[in-house]
């Protein structure tokens, strides 16, 4: 007999060589029917797995979040099986689960059409209804290569050929379809019920542009119909909110081929950019940061000394001049260390909080560029805190509080924290890492954040915190970071005089709240769907006249508002007032000030707020006071 330990703490005895499915069935028939996979001693396995020894066991159903990846992997196989039935001449390549879905790569001469996707999806539904059994098979490597070559699946044969000789190969069979896979998989195709094929795109074999182009079918799959419907609704909403679309509609920015990955900011977009920078600058100043400006172009010798040349050389833009190699900086940290090193620093100077809106350049692949979300030229709300070891916790607490304030001001209150601890390959000894990790954990707990652990995901030079925002339609964005660094101060020979009189290395905390300003503005455009709050809106008040004889008063109102640093637009054309209001509403301007004869006579305006039907009559002084009060909360 063997002892099986369950998650509830119970231990039960079963006959040796029992399968996981038989254990599920012994517990209850309904559990066995719902079971998808099993976790044995922390490793996910098929239900057909034979258990020979004592173990910890957990039976998983579609209700367990871990099964979502299984469902998506099963859906990928289901897609390939459907394609092979419909288009037998097509070769299959690879099909992994990815975030929110899966893809499968195919090789065929004729491109898949939209109609083909609908046909494939219908065939998948047929296979689900058949509830075909999914079985795991162990094959000899060479025989597996021979088999796939015999059925014309050259890509599968190539993948297997890259596996060391002598290794056993795992194949999964469902109906007439067989695929190379490590697994695990559900017992049958009937477990994949809620899916949709999304699109077709090109993809190079093995991700190498020198290889042949394959066709990649993307799909999504979920555990319930509600989850699928919610995801499709989110995608539909995301398409409406696409920052590239709204950016064009609101005349905020554009991109063009002559400067790939570089933003052409228009006046309204640049207004948003500068307002955010002004806001962050004020927050930093209140929290004891100094602001600096460092060169954009720096000799490669500094990047070699910092270690960035060895690690990021391929991602850096370089040029040669006067027998020197210069690089556009991809980050600000080595330059900040140079400022720290100017003059002798004492323990009394710490912590030194140094901020910069530093212009950085990164040579991102053209295929990875995506509007404001992924660019080659970017500015970060970057700062580095030089501190003593004993100051790490307090500085982290201070930063977390500042970050929370900033996110709240932009409307984000759902903040998730990820804590990444020591990787296997790392600098520093365990004692240093123990102190560093304890300091960060203590700080996060003091602020009241609940964090999830990313084991071993820290940088080799220190642990880190990542801060993830959830937007209005449920998407998550990792923006803020706090990264501890023991290595860079040593590499660049930064030190301070301790109270004892000896030289010590400062600890360096790399931190950002927004991350790239370009990306954060993209996130905000989609979060607000272009409807910016009044303090951030590029045009705060739009003035519209009912008749032309009111134009002089309207221009007088505009001048008064501009003199009070209020951003305005005006339409004094002969167009009808309803047309003017509609045009300004399409631009999502927070306030429209309508001027008629009555308003002129009383030195007033009638205010229509965006998204509301009501109106409010205000004096010019009242309007100015209202907007100034709103601005003063942030700027």
Swiss-Prot record:
- What is written in the cofactor note of this entry? Binds 1 zinc ion per subunit.
> Which residues hold Zn(2+)?
333, 384, 510
What cofactor is this protein dependent on?
Zn(2+)
User: Which keywords, in A-to-Z order, does the entry hold?
Assistant: Aminoacyl-tRNA synthetase, ATP-binding, Cytoplasm, Ligase, Metal-binding, Nucleotide-binding, Protein biosynthesis, RNA-binding, tRNA-binding, Zinc
Q: EC number(s)?
A: 6.1.1.3
Q: Which reaction does it catalyse?
A: tRNA(Thr) + L-threonine + ATP = L-threonyl-tRNA(Thr) + AMP + diphosphate + H(+)
User: Which CDD domains did the record assign?
Assistant: TGS_ThrRS, ThrRS_anticodon, ThrRS_core
Q: What class of enzyme is it?
A: ligase
**Localization in the cell:** Cytoplasm
Gene3D superfamilies in the record, alphabetically? Answer: 3.10.20.30, 3.30.54.20, Anticodon-binding domain, Bira Bifunctional Protein, Domain 2, Threonyl-trna Synthetase, Chain A, domain 2
Q: Which InterPro entries match?
A: aa-tRNA-synt_IIb, aa-tRNA-synth_II, aa-tRNA-synth_II/BPL/LPL, Anticodon-bd, Anticodon-bd_dom_sf, Beta-grasp_dom_sf, TGS, TGS-like
Q: What PROSITE patterns has UniProt attached to this entry? A: AA_TRNA_LIGASE_II (PS50862), TGS (PS51880)
User: SUPFAM superfamilies this protein is in?
Assistant: Class II aaRS ABD-related, Class II aaRS and biotin synthetases, TGS-like, ThrRS/AlaRS common domain
This protein's major location comes to: cytoplasm
Q: Where is this region: Catalytic?
A: 242-533
Look up the record and report any one GO term of the cellular component aspect: cytoplasm
User: What processes does the entry annotate via GO biological process terms?
Assistant: threonyl-tRNA aminoacylation
Q: Domain TGS, which positions? A: 1-61
Entry keyword Transcription regulation: no
MF term (GO), any: threonine-tRNA ligase activity
Describe the family membership recorded for this protein in Swiss-Prot or TrEMBL.
Belongs to the class-II aminoacyl-tRNA synthetase family.
Q: What does this protein do?
A: Catalyzes the attachment of threonine to tRNA(Thr) in a two-step reaction: L-threonine is first activated by ATP to form Thr-AMP and then transferred to the acceptor end of tRNA(Thr). Also edits incorrectly charged L-seryl-tRNA(Thr).
Question: How does the annotation summarize its subunit structure?
Answer: Homodimer.
Name of the protein described by the UniProt record: Threonine--tRNA ligase
Species annotation: Rickettsia typhi (strain ATCC VR-144 / Wilmington)
């Amino acid at each position: 007999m063997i002892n099986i330990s369950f998650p509830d703490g119970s231990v039960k005895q079963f006959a040796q060589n029992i399968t996981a499915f038989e254990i599920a069935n012994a517990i209850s028939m309904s559990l066995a029917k719902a079971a998808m996979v099993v976790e044995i001693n922390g490793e996910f396995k098929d239900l057909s797995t034979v258990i020979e020894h004592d173990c910890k066991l957990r039976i998983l159903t579609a209700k367990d979040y871990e099964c979502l990846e299984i469902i998506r992997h099963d859906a990928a196989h289901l897609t390939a099986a459907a394609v092979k039935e419909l288009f037998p001449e097509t070769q299959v390549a690879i099909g992994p689960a990815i975030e929110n879905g899966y893809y499968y790569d195919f090789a065929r001469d004729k491109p898949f059409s939209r109609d083909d996707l609908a046909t494939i999806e219908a065939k998948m539904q047929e296979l689900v209804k058949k509830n075909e059994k999914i079985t795991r098979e162990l094959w000899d490597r060479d025989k597996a290569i021979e088999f796939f070559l015999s059925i014309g699946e050259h890509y599968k044969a190539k993948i297997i050929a890259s596996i060391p000789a002598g290794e056993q190969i795992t194949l999964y069979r469902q109906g007439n379809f067989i695929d190379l896979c490590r697994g695990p998989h559900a017992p049958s195709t009937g477990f994949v019920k809620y899916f949709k094929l999304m699109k077709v795109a090109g993809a190079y074999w093995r991700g190498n542009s020198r290889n042949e182009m394959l066709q990649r079918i993307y799909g999504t799959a979920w555990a319930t119909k509600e989850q699928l419907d919610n995801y499709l609704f989110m995608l539909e909403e995301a398409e409406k909110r696409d920052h590239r679309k709204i950016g064009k509609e609101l005349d905020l920015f554009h991109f063009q081929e002559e400067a790939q990955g570089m933003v052409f900011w228009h006046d309204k977009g640049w207004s948003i950019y500068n307002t955010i920078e002004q806001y962050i600058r004020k927050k930093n100043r209140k929290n004891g940061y100094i602001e600096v400006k460092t060169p954009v172009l720096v000799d490669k010798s500094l990047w070699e000394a910092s270690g960035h040349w060895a690690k990021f050389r391929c991602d850096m833009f370089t040029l040669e001049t006067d027998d020197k190699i210069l690089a556009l900086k991809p980050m600000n940290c080595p330059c900040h260390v140079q400022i720290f090193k100017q003059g002798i620093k004492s323990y009394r100077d710490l912590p030194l909080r140094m901020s910069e809106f530093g212009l950085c350049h990164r040579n991102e692949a053209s295929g990875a560029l995506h509007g404001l979300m992924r660019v080659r030229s970017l500015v970060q709300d970057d700062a580095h805190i030089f501190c003593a070891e004993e100051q790490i916790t307090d500085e982290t607490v201070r930063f977390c509080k500042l970050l929370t304030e900033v996110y709240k001001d932009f409307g984000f209150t759902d903040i998730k924290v990820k804590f990444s601890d020591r990787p296997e390959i790392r600098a520093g000894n365990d004692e240093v890492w123990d102190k560093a990790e304890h300091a960060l954990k203590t700080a996060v707990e003091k602020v009241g954040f609940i964090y999830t652990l990313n084991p071993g995901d820290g940088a080799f030079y220190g642990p880190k915190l990542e801060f993830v925002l959830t937007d209005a339609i449920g998407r998550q964005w990792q923006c803020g970071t706090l990264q501890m660094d023991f290595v860079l101060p040593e590499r660049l020979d930064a030190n301070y005089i301790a109270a004892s009189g000896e030289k010590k290395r400062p600890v360096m905390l790399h931190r950002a709240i927004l991350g790239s300003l370009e990306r954060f503005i993209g996130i905000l455009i989609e979060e607000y769907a272009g409807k910016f709050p009044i303090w951030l809106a590029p045009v705060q008040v739009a003035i519209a006249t009912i008749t032309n004889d009111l134009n002089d008063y309207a221009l007088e109102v505009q001048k008064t508002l501009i003199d009070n640093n209020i951003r305005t637009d005006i339409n004094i054309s002969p167009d009808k007032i309803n047309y003017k209001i509609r045009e300004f509403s399409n631009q999502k301007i927070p306030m429209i000030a309508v001027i008629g004869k009555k308003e002129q006579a009383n030195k007033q305006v009638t205010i229509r707020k965006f998204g509301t039907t009501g109106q409010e009559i205000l004096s010019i002084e009242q309007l100015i006071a209202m907007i100034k009060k709103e601005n003063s909360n942030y700027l």
